[in-house]
């Protein structure tokens, strides 16, 4: 249900976009793909699990394999992890409740299309809105992820300190966003499209969406 939010944010940046119904499949040769937030299939079974097994995800994986930029946001991040586009999994928040609030993110890797507008260590404010946003992954796989510089963002406080108190959902090592095997595929739980329009609040999320320019 965040598809229109994503379209509005992209079009505010001058990026033409269209909403594609899952049953219709992807148009040929898209310049980029956003898997938006929402509650696909009511989040039954696990958030993103059923949507990850729909035929259009075969199209998305094929596009990603060909080098098309793919960004999964919130439920789109859950779908991305469930479909194997990115490592790890997103599970129930430590609080065991839905959380909708602004959070701070620290940029961990600025050498990607999604973070080219920032510097390493920059702190941006972007809202979250999820009940299953806690990032989990085996310790050895997390170590490999960190060694490969595939962590995009971590939850932090306003000063950029990654602390347990600043971690809204209990994500392992404060991870808020990660890259796939290649840096043109990324997922994150916070909503950059909700931090892109100056008439509703901070615009720190614009830099992420500018990867589609």
What function would you assign to each model-found segment?
Residues 1-73, 80-87, 91-98, 106, ...:
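N-terminal beta1-alpha1 cap of cysteine-dependent amidohydrolase-like domains
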Residues 9, 114-213:
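C-terminal and late-domain segments of enzyme folds
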Residues 37-39, 75, 131, 190:
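Glycine-rich His-Gly loop
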Residues 41-44, 104, 118, 155:
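Sequence-level detector for tyrosine residue identity
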Residues 76-77, 102, 142:
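Hydrophobic, well-ordered secondary-structure segments
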Residues 76-78, 85, 96-97, 109-112, ...:
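Short acidic/polar capping segments at secondary-structure boundaries
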Residues 91-122, 128-129:
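Alpha/beta-hydrolase-fold enzymes
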């Amino acid at each position: 249900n965040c598809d229109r939010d994503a379209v509005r944010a992209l079009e505010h940046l001058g990026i033409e976009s269209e909403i594609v119904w899952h049953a219709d499949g992807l148009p040929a040769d898209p310049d980029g793909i956003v898997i938006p937030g929402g509650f696909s299939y009511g989040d039954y079974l696990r958030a993103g699990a059923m949507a990850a097994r729909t035929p259009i995800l075969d199209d998305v994986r094929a596009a990603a394999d060909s080098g098309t930029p793919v960004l999964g946001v919130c439920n789109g991040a859950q779908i991305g992890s469930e479909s194997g586009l990115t490592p790890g999994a997103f599970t129930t928040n430590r609080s065991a409740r839905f959380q909708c609030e602004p959070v701070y993110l620290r940029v961990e890797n600025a050498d990607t299309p999604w973070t080219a507008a920032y510097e390493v260590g920059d702190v941006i404010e972007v809202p979250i809105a999820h009940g299953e946003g806690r990032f989990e992954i085996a310790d050895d796989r997390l170590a490999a992820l960190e060694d490969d510089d595939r962590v995009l963002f971590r939850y932090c406080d306003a000063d950029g300190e990654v602390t347990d108190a600043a971690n809204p959902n209990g994500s392992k090592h404060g991870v808020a966003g990660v890259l796939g095997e290649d840096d043109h595929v990324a997922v994150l739980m916070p909503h950059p499209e909700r931090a892109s329009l100056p008439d509703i609040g901070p615009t720190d999320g614009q830099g992420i969406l500018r990867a589609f320019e």
